[in-house]
């Protein structure tokens, strides 16, 4: 199952279809954004096979300059990939899903390739995949918050930030080998 009503939180056990779905979507995005996409990666909890995740595929598209994506907004929309704006500073958000049912299946984050946010996404995913105990710690936090905030995605997301910050520091130390 892929997809979740906007604003809600529900975690599901990892499903192999998430990686397959992500790969198909990455291939489609590569075709659509070939001139500007430097790299496209599957990120987020659906990219960590050992943990439960919201059934929404997160992808990150790295570009050299955020302005490079503007000419592609209409083309992406023609392929049911809808621009939602700058969700956080320096990051453009596109979504896919069943908009009539207010369900989202994919969050596509467009950011500066090899910048701080790009490295955060990649390092976090790789760190949790490399260290199962850290993934379990993150999953426990997610499960607790999902039970508490099933209809409040903002509070769920905010509740994870302290742990994510600590794990990111550990991930950067691990990645740099220090």
Which role fits each region the language model picked out?
Residues 63, 112, 158:
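Conserved residues at beta->alpha junctions
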Residues 80-115:
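Conserved catalytic core of two-metal-ion nucleotidyltransferases
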Residues 71-79:
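Short amphipathic alpha-helices in soluble, non-transmembrane regions
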Residues 1-41, 165:
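Helical scaffold of the NTase/Pol beta-like nucleotidyltransferase catalytic core
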Residues 29-70:
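Active-site nucleotide-donor binding segment shared across nucleotidyl transfer reactions
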Residues 7-9, 55-59, 104-106, 124:
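Short amphipathic alpha-helical segments
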Residues 116-178:
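Catalytic cores of NTP-dependent nucleotidyl/adenyl transfer enzymes across multiple folds
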């Amino acid at each position: 199952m892929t997809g979740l009503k906007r604003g809600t939180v529900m975690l599901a056990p990892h499903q192999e279809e998430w990686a397959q779905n992500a790969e198909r979507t990455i291939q489609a995005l590569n075709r659509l954004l070939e001139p500007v996409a430097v790299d496209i990666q599957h990120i987020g909890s659906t990219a960590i096979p050992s943990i439960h995740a919201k059934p929404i595929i997160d992808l990150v598209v790295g570009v050299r300059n955020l302005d490079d994506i503007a000419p592609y907004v209409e083309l992406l929309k023609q392929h049911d990939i809808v621009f939602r704006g700058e969700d956080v500073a320096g990051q453009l958000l596109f979504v896919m899903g069943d908009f009539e049912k207010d369900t989202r299946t994919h969050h596509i984050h467009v950011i500066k390739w090899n910048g701080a946010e790009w490295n955060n996404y990649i390092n976090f995913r790789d760190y949790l995949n490399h260290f199962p105990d850290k993934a379990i710690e993150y999953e426990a936090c997610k499960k607790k918050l999902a039970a508490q905030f099933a209809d409040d995605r903002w509070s769920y997301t905010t509740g994870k930030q302290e742990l994510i910050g600590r794990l990111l520091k550990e991930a950067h130390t691990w990645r740099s080998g220090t």
